[in-house]
Amino acid sequence: MSMTADSQSDYAFLESIRRHLLGESEPILSESTASSVTQSCVTGQSIKPVYGRNPSFSKLYPCFTESWGDLPLKENDSEDMLVYGILNDAFHGGWEPSSSSSDEDRSSFPSVKIETPESFAAVDSVPVKKEKTSPVSAAVTAAKGKHYRGVRQRPWGKFAAEIRDPAKNGARVWLGTFETAEDAALAYDRAAFRMRGSRALLNFPLRVNSGEPDPVRIKSKRSSFSSSNENGAPKKRRTVAAGGGMDKGLTVKCEVVEVARGDRLLVL
């Protein structure tokens, strides 16, 4: 009974393949046919196929014969022969797309013409003037792009270093004005290291104790003038002559008179 059921399922599978290839619709069973099929399935009776089996076709397909048995194809039926030809081509040569379909696909896309660089017209190059930047302006722009902790830039381009002293309730302590932002940042690092030790957040941690000299501060003109006076000669005070308050038009004549009085000589 199991062999009969297998052959029926194989036949139904091949029939569905044939109908799919030929574009036919699935047959609609009537009520009487459906009831007979249901009764035969319940009672275990086998349903006879419509077409007879031809063993000559199954000899060409050993793999089909091993799994499905003989194929239910008729030699006199044109539809069965069409199915046989399709299966034969698929078994021996494999499925290959037709050349006509590939040609149609190629013709559906527009042709693209690729031009070589030689076909392009030569374009005259326009000379571009390169603006020369001075090293001072380049250094200023580079310094503006980077910000250091505890450093503020003055409006005139110099850099001031400041730090908040925790001993003075976070008041700002001015550390000086420097030429570059790096010098101001280094001055801040050294002041922060002296106040907070290893807990301080530094700009250059490796340069704090490297033995570098202290950055040079920018001194104001007033302080530099006072320091030069302290180190040099004393200040010159303006002295007014005895007759400074007189009118310019008044002239004073002085005469020297020698008077001899005994042994002494008096000059008046």
From Swiss-Prot:
SUPFAM superfamilies per record: DNA-binding domain
Chain segments carrying region Disordered: 215-244
A cellular component annotation (GO) from this entry: nucleus
Keyword annotations: Activator, DNA-binding, Ethylene signaling pathway, Nucleus, Plant defense, Transcription, Transcription regulation
Predominant localisation class: nucleus
PROSITE patterns: AP2_ERF (PS51032)
One annotated GO biological process: cell division
Induction: Induced by Pseudomonas syringae tomato (both virulent and avirulent avrRpt2 strains), independently of PAD4. Also induced by methyl jasmonate (MeJA) independently of JAR1. Ethylene induction is completely dependent on a functional ETHYLENE-INSENSITIVE2 (EIN2), whereas induction by wounding does not need EIN2. Induction by salicylic acid (SA) seems to be independent of PAD4 and NPR1. Transcripts accumulate strongly in cycloheximide-treated plants, a protein synthesis inhibitor. Seems to not be influenced by exogenous abscisic acid (ABA), cold, heat, NaCl or drought stress.
Organs and tissues of expression: Ubiquitously expressed, mostly in flowers and rosettes after ethylene treatment.
Molecular function, one GO term: transcription cis-regulatory region binding
DNA-binding region(s), residue ranges: 147-205
Locus of motif Nuclear localization signal: 221-237
Subcellular location: Nucleus
Notes on the domains: The AP2/ERF domain binds specifically to the 5'-GCCGCC-3' motif. The affinity of this binding is higher if the seventh amino-acid of this domain is basic.
Membership in a protein family: Belongs to the AP2/ERF transcription factor family. ERF subfamily.
Protein's job: Acts as a transcriptional activator. Binds to the GCC-box pathogenesis-related promoter element. Involved in the regulation of gene expression by stress factors and by components of stress signal transduction pathways.
UniProt protein name: Ethylene-responsive transcription factor 1A
Gene giving rise to this polypeptide: ERF1A
